[in-house]
Amino acid sequence: MPVKAASGAPSRGRLLLALFPATLTALLALAACRSDHRTPVVLYSPHGRDLLSLLEHTYEKAHPNIDVRWLDMGSQEVYDRVRSEKANPQADVWFGGPDTIFFRGAREDLLEACRPTWAAAIPPEAREPRGLYYGAYRTPAVIVYNSGAIPPAEAPKDWDDLLDPRWKGKIIIRYPLASGTMRAIFGLILSRSIEKTGSTAEGFAWLRRLDAQTRSYEMNASVLVQRIARREGLVTVWDLPDVLLETKHSRELGWVLPSSGTPVIDDAIGLVKGAKHPAEARAFIEWVGSVEAQRLAADRAYRLPARTDIPAGDLPAWARDVEQRLVPAKLDWERLEREGSAWMATWDREVRGKGNR
């Protein structure tokens, strides 16, 4: 069987930046020439247009001297770009992605210490001891299905249900090499294999069975859930905020919190080392973690706050419901950080497109 091709074209902006490494610098310089003398704060983020636009407009309204600019890409792509630009950083704020990726960034000296006033409200396990990054949101992974084609009672309820023969050819998966969310989900499967047998072999066998069920691997995260809504596939796995945002546009989306537990990603934020606008970047980070901005993100962009000092009664109904039903999976995040890249290389070499062999 030929290897499955990752479907979906990157956006025009992403394609230009991928093809021409100097494009970002040129675009920022051009924008500066046309600016109204505001100070730019450049964000690299996987958080998507809805949240980024919301924060951009809200922050700029309160700080008219600031021009918030952002580049939306996968969390692994953010890391790769910040790393490649280390000698001449173009971003000011690294905003979003699992803290396992931020750990790598800290180890490679890509981040600079920043100590916002809300740091103590973040659990110790979700903040770097030296102040290099902090959790901003808690992001659970969910099973997503087309509720127009699948009655809720018949939808997959847990990870193993994805291997049921009735879903063969009906699953679309986000291309995991570019996605921190998918690395966490695949990492959960492999970690459980190690815990049970002492080896990843059973976990990779599970992933091969999932590959046999998979219709395609989607490169573009922004259209993954849309494809399920359009019935190009019927089932996927992805992060809850993106799914809830898409339900504003489609009534044919349902989601399930896996009954055995799901990865809950500490979506972090940090100051890029060598940022061109460090003071403005620190001020933006301070605002993102403020009670005001955390509530705004929960109300308008379906983000669970990382802060532990916000009363449940101050959160929207959807967040209270998720917190009550959520079963966080026990996942060895340190092992995932150490071995995740090797696991993904093995998946790409030995699993992708080989499930039916």
Tell where the protein language model's regions lie, with residue ranges.
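Short, well-ordered beta-strand elements
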Residues: R38-G48, I66-L71, K170-I171
